[in-house]
Amino acid sequence: MSAATIKDPRDVVLAPVVSEKSYGLIDEGKYTFLVDPRSNKTEIKLAVEKIFSVKVESINTINRAGKRKRTKFGWGTRKNTKRAIVTLKEGTIDIFGGPLA
């Protein structure tokens, strides 16, 4: 990789996804993140390993099309998003900063 292609990890991994399904996957060692739609699996893997100091086993990505919504001025669309489900080899990530309620 050249210096021009190296991205800041916080520009690749934007936020954890908080949902019922993502909570259920944590027990299996899988963590779900909202990521930059232009990033690929290799960039996501390097970013997660650097931010959380863990080893990544695999990554599954999901491209989600923005919903079509009615506005005051006609029809518009929300922006497209991308999610990454990251499976860890070992270890855990303290995403939410405390015990689950």
UniProtKB/Swiss-Prot annotation:
Part of the 50S ribosomal subunit. Contacts protein L29, and trigger factor when it is bound to the ribosome. Pfam families: Ribosomal_L23. NCBIfam families: PRK05738.2-4, PRK05738.2-5. One of its GO terms (cellular component) is ribonucleoprotein complex. It comes from Arthrobacter sp. (strain FB24). GO terms for biological process: translation. This is Large ribosomal subunit protein uL23. Keywords: Ribonucleoprotein, Ribosomal protein, RNA-binding, rRNA-binding. Belongs to the universal ribosomal protein uL23 family. HAMAP family: Ribosomal_uL23_B. The gene is rplW.
